[in-house]
């Protein structure tokens, strides 16, 4: 697994951690597509939630498109694609795999040629496509929650994930943090090979010249999305639950005749108020 790069000491992920992962990669249980470029390690479990992360490329020259499918809860890599395909074909592949994996959240990097792949997903009517906020320098779920951003109303959003010079370092930070904790469950030797040549160069994390980092960046996108968009969605659900819980029914309790018939219970602690002033 490109062990000759270990001595450089400039890999984004620590060499000891890469060595740990090199001992845990495994062959896929199925290879699909022309050339067998779609690798499957786990078939969909319909009790789980998945996220499909797509990094499109032109499909010619040295550019590869990369795709990862992540089990959102366990951070396990369940499927992967790396290959040279046109953006339309890649878009159809993204939608098909996302649909197969329980209508997974489909996250497509929309920079440059990525819009063509996003358009395929839009034209297909896929319902669980990820949207980014317009004019957002970076995504901070805490800021968005405080601003009460609406995750359903798409008027202020654009389809796909917008990667910028400000968000890319955040992706890398998530990648470093999770791998340092050895939290992701990685099966792919292709991804591991890319991690071995994913280096710090002049302060920027990128593949060594002549190599690609499509799989690394799509995985980093997934970790970022897991901690932002998916957290925002869950927080929104929790806020709704709390709101519904705090809506108390007003129940009129009939009092017996006699001395207590002009009393009314108030509050939640059994307090009693006399209504005799109404007489």
Identify the function of each model-found stretch.
Residues 159-160, 167:
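Accessory nucleic-acid engagement/destabilization modules that flank
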Residues 1-134, 141, 165, 169-173, ...:
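RNase H-like, metal-dependent nuclease domains and their acidic two-metal-ion catalytic environment used
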């Amino acid at each position: 697994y490109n062990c000759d790069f270990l001595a450089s000491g400039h890999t984004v992920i620590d060499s000891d951690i890469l060595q740990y992962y090199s001992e845990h990669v495994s062959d896929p249980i199925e290879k699909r597509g022309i050339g067998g470029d779609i690798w499957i390690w786990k078939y969909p479990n319909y009790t789980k939630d998945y996220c499909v992360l797509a990094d499109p490329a032109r499909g010619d020259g040295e550019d590869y498109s990369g795709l990862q499918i992540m089990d959102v809860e366990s951070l396990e890599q369940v499927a992967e694609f790396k290959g040279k395909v046109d953006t339309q074909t890649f878009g159809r592949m993204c939608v098909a795999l996302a649909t197969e994996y329980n209508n997974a959240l489909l996250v497509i990097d929309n920079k440059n040629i990525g819009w063509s792949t996003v358009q395929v997903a839009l034209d297909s009517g896929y319902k669980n496509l990820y949207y980014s906020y317009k004019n957002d320098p970076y995504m901070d779920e805490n800021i968005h929650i405080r601003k009460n951003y609406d995750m359903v109303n798409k008027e202020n959003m654009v389809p796909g994930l917008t990667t910028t010079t400000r968000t890319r370092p955040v992706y890398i930070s998530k990648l470093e943090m999770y791998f340092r904790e050895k939290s992701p469950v990685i099966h792919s030797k292709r991804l591991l090979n890319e991690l071995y040549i994913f280096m710090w160069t002049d302060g920027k994390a990128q593949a060594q010249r002549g190599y690609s980092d499509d799989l690394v960046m799509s995985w980093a996108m997934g970790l970022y999305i897991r901690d932002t968009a998916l957290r925002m969605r869950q927080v929104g659900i929790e806020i709704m639950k709390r709101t519904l819980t705090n809506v108390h029914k007003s129940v009129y309790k009939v009092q017996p005749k006699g001395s207590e018939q002009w009393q009314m219970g108030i509050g939640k602690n059994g307090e009693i108020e006399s209504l005799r002033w109404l007489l």
